[in-house]
Structures are given as C-alpha cells and as structure tokens.
C-alpha cells in the first residue's frame, strides 16, 4: 500500500509570527487530513522538543533541525546527523574572531555563548525564552548537537562559511542562520 504524506514547516507557515499560534482552521483541516490516513510530517529548523504550539495537530513525525534530527512523534529516533567536534571547534574560533553570537542546539536544550540584542529579538520573534548563556564548549561535549546558529548578517555568513567546508547554512532571517552538517537539509530528511 502506498503511503501518502504532507510536509509542513512551522515558523511563518503553521505558526504565525504575529500571533505565535496555529489558526484553529488549520488545526481542524489537519485533523481531517490525518483521519484520511494521510501522514502529517513537520519539517522545521526547530528542535523536536520545541513544538509546543503544535500539540493539537496529529502529526506523525518530525524532520527537525533542518533534517539533522528525524524522529517519530513519540521521540523514537529515525536518523540523526550530529555536528562533528572539529567543525564545532572551528565555528567557536570564528565566533570569537568575528565577534558574533553562537548558539548550539543539543538534546539538552539551546545555549548561547553571549546575549546580544539580536539573540533577544529572535527569541521574541518566535515566542521562545531567551536561550541561557553557557559554556557552549562544555554543553557541546556533554550532549548531542545537531545544529548551530550563527547570529550575523549574510555578508559575514559568507566569509565564515567559506572556512567551513564540512557544514552548510540555511537562513530565514537577515540576522541569523542555522548551520548543519553539509548535505543535510529538510529534503534529505524527507528521503
């Protein structure tokens, strides 16, 4: 039997940047889709543990962290592509050199090396708590990190990423970008 599925993004698609909620009409439509034996799969840059706004949606699986962490709704892992330590260490050096804030997304949460107005504004934009400042090297070593976040403009991003051939970048905001293992993206997660 052929499986049918729909794939949906979260921020700016299911969840409005204005209301920070999923419209009731979308919830009802997706409940009908699910009742028709069509799988609902969330494809997002967010972590699997950061989907509280979607509790009423009967999704089946999540392609989280831009394809780096694919899990069933109950948390059963399907695949996970972690940032290699050598690449993380290089990004950490570049963050210090260029002076941009750096966040890591691990199985223990999101942590930043510094708070600045951009970090605070982006947390507000997606209605998240501001990530705590931590020793991100220690947090990286003590957890499973599948995504980094660099808080810089596109010009600096190009300069930084030219020095990181093992990583790739995706951007949905002019002052922030997600960084994953090269070749990892939502399309790979779908496959």
Predicted regions and their residues:
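Structured loop/turn residues at beta-strand edges in well-structured enzyme cores
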Residues: 1, 57, 143
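Asp-based phosphoryl-transfer active-site loop
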Residues: 2-19, 44
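Short, basic/glycine-rich phosphate-binding loops at helix/coil junctions
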Residues: 7-10, 69-72, 139-141, 170-171
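Flexible loop residues that form catalytic
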Residues: 11, 67, 153
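Short, flexible loop segments at the rims of nucleotide/cofactor-binding pockets, characterized by
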Residues: 17-20, 40-41, 80-81, 125-128
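Active-site phosphate-binding/coordination module
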Residues: 24-118
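Conserved acidic, metal-coordinating active-site core of Asp-based
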Residues: 98-101, 105-191
């Amino acid at each position: 039997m052929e499986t049918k599925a729909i794939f949906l993004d979260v921020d700016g698609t299911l969840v409005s940047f204005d209301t920070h909620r999923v419209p009731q009409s979308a919830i009802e439509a997706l409940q009908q889709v699910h009742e028709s034996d069509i799988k609902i799969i969330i494809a997002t840059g967010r972590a699997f543990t950061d989907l509280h706004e979607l509790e009423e949606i009967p999704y089946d699986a999540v392609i989280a962290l831009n394809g780096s962490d694919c899990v069933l709704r109950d948390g059963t892992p399907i695949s996970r592509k972690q940032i290699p330590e050598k690449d993380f260490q290089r990004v950490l050096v570049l963050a210090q050199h260029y002076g941009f804030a750096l966040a890591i997304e691990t199985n223990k949460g999101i942590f930043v090396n510094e708070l600045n107005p951009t970090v605070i504004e982006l947390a507000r934009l997606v209605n998240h708590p501001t990530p705590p400042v931590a020793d991100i090297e220690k947090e990286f070593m003590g957890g499973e990190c599948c995504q980094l976040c660099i808080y810089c403009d596109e010009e600096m991003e190009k300069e930084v990423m030219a020095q990181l051939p093992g990583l790739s970048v995706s951007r949905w905001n002019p002052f922030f970008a997600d960084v994953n293992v090269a070749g990892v993206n939502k399309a790979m997660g779908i496959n």
